[in-house]
Amino acid sequence: AEWRAQPPTNPLSPDPLPWRVTLHHTDGRYTMSLAESLEETRFIQDFHQNGRKWSDIAYHYVVDAAGNIIEARPLETLGAHTLNNNEGNVGIVLLGRYHAPRNDQTTAPQLAAVATLGRFLVKRFGLEPASLKGHRDYKQTDCPGDLAYPKLPELRAAFGVPSKRLATVEAVDWDGQRARNSAASPSATR
């Protein structure tokens, strides 16, 4: 495809009505530039498709420390990020390791980007802000890390704050171009 990611290896299952959100961390590179973040997202997709033999990257959105939002798996499809809990579940992943021994730090732009995504999902699908969970709420794992997990109450509160700007969410497609994901048309170009 023109955005330099691989197409899904198999058809993705539809999941058109999300009702919850799960926050993850990649446990990988902590990136600050859009170019590095796109490269890391392609690496994750390659690992998921060729290493884990999944159809596509597991997550719907990737967020870097600079606050860039990268659309990954199409929003209207079933994710592969929370074993036995993917139905109706939007996966948002932070690039980096927010846990010992590295302890990458969350940033204000990154948290603002997650909050923007959350408000968009609340407005578009009627999600309850309380539906935001960390991966560790579903299984025994460090994810999304001891430094990101405590941010969940703050993010839940931000999900519920109305914003005039939320008619659309601006995400970055994989060429680094800005793609608008509107409430009327939730499919931004990957």
Residue ranges and their predicted role:
Residues 1-26, 65-190:
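Basic/polar, cationic surfaces and motifs that engage anionic cell-wall
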